[in-house]
Amino acid sequence: MTSWVQHPSMVQTLITIRRARWTDAEEIAEVHDAAWRDAYRGLIPGRELERMISRRGPQWWMSAIERGSRLLVLDFNEAIVGYVTYGRNRVPSLPSKGEIFELYLEPEFQGLGFGRKLFEAARDDLAAHGYPNFIVWALGDNERAIGFYDHLGGKMVRCAQERFGQEERERVAFAFP
């Protein structure tokens, strides 16, 4: 999927959403690092956050791509600035067939409609592969994520606890028809 974005300065910029390639692993790791620090600083204990980020370096992403994980990237002027991962729902007790596992953008690209574009691309691919309905989990304290998925029409269907070191945080599942 390729589209043009019109900036207020009247400059057109090409964005592309496409399947990740192994050569994207380094940039995806950089997006992951920046987005997680921005989204979870103060929500996930510092040591746990650093541990989680460090596990997802370029080698981890290269392996995910080589395994055939469903992973789309948003390419903005030939730079990866966002990604989304998705597949079969991991919680069988929920009726949704699919799941968006992660959707992240570089912090400076949030609020520009790029997250919606990644979401819609993942939604369309899930539907094309037999997953017409899906869920997305977000930390309950992550107000931006909660607002984003609510704005897109998600309905809160489940709350669960997730442990980060010695602390627990609530996470919320949003269902999309």
Residue spans for each PLM region:
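Conserved beta-strand-loop-alpha-helix junction that forms the acyl-donor binding cleft
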Residues: 136-145, 163-168
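Active-site acidic-Proline motif in GNAT/NAT acetyltransferases
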Residues: 106-108, 112, 140-141
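Structural motif
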Residues: 31, 129, 151-152
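Acetyl-CoA-dependent GNAT
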Residues: 15, 19-25, 30-108, 116-121, ...
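Conserved GNAT acetyl-CoA-binding A-motif
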Residues: 127-137
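Terminal substrate-recognition subdomain of acyl/acetyltransferases
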Residues: 2-7, 11, 170-177
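Short phosphate-binding/catalytic loops that engage adenosine nucleotides
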Residues: 114, 131, 154
